[in-house]
């Protein structure tokens, strides 16, 4: 694997272990040329997924972009990294096992919203404000009212 520091084509694996509940392999690597240390993750990819954007343009699915969406919504929120990784892995697994190779971006957005709803209400509102293109305070009030009603119905969750 190419070293991210010096670009050398050779690196050595120093440690390998299961990650993400056995759905990935975490490898600790070292570059023999510059001594740089870095971590890589190896995951099973069932099929090559393409995302259909709102404009109709098709782009390859990017797991890291999905993870960044969660990280942005959950910034400064008390949610463990493991829970975020599990949510992302769950979405990826559902997408890959759906049988479809082309997936509308709206479908991914809905799955992210569902996952955030169970992770953190504030992150859910943050993501919904961008995903649903909120333009007025009333838009926020509606979503917050929905969350408040859910909490009143299911106080234990």
Swiss-Prot record:
One of its GO terms (molecular function) is DNA binding. Residues 11-21 have a biased composition (Basic and acidic residues). Residues 49-139 form the ATP-cone domain. A zinc finger (unnamed) spans 3-34. Its cofactor is Zn(2+). Binds 1 zinc ion. Residues 1-21 are annotated as: Disordered. It comes from the Bacteria. Keywords: ATP-binding, DNA-binding, Metal-binding, Nucleotide-binding, Repressor, Transcription, Transcription regulation, Zinc, Zinc-finger. One of its GO terms (biological process) is negative regulation of DNA-templated transcription. It holds the Pfam family Zn_ribbon_NrdR. Signal peptide: none annotated. InterPro entries: ATP-cone_dom, NrdR-like_N, RNR_NrdR-like. Belongs to the NrdR family. NCBIfam families: transcriptional regulator NrdR. Negatively regulates transcription of bacterial ribonucleotide reductase nrd genes and operons by binding to NrdR-boxes. This is Transcriptional repressor NrdR. It comes from Rhizobium meliloti (strain 1021) (Ensifer meliloti). The gene is nrdR.
